[in-house]
Amino acid sequence: MAKGLIGEKLGMAHIFNNDGKMVTVTVLRVGPCFVSQVKTEANDGYEAVQLAFGDAKEKHLTKAELGHIKKANIATPKKTLVEFKGFEGVAVGSEVKLADIFALDDTVKVTGTSKGKGTQGVVKRHGFAGGPAGHGSRFQRHPGSIGSNTTPGRVFKGLKMGGRMGSEQTTVRNLKVVKIDADANLVFVSGPVPGRERGIVTIEKIG
């Protein structure tokens, strides 16, 4: 992962940009993030920085997780740990601020967990057109044929069918940073991002 931060999705809104045009944005509360571990080529085989985000109660964390946070001299337990690359000269226990990473008009990508939709059919899940809607049709939202007869005598793997939809890691790329409120740790990015409100996301700088 590239240089970035952890945050949560607060919701969507409309704001006016400098040209007076209304822009649809998603509001993200990014940080405060603290460095919980610095991984090096010598010790771990690769270089990365692990950031911690989101206060948690001690009873909700394991002893190993609590010990990991305590070793990093972070005052309060954190519930989310994510590794990023591209950081230089950061110390364990230090805070990484929003203004240190992002600026206006930056191009970013946002990764989150998409909303769970439960069990859905092929029309909603895969965008199938479906059949005729009337005049005696019995084929409306059905998937249709799933294979041949004796040959090959089986259903090929990967065939699009109904099933569980959503609750998957999803990334949206090439979003623009429209506005930043460093005091409130808020980032306004153009367009929608995956996940529900209060869902955890990572925002990474592109380029």
Swiss-Prot record:
Transmembrane segments: none
Annotated GO CC locations: cytosolic large ribosomal subunit
Intrachain S-S bonds: none
Top-level division of the source organism's lineage: Bacteria
Gene Ontology molecular function: any one: rRNA binding
Subunit structure: Part of the 50S ribosomal subunit. Forms a cluster with proteins L14 and L19.
Function: One of the primary rRNA binding proteins, it binds directly near the 3'-end of the 23S rRNA, where it nucleates assembly of the 50S subunit.
Assigned protein family: Belongs to the universal ribosomal protein uL3 family.
The protein's name: Large ribosomal subunit protein uL3
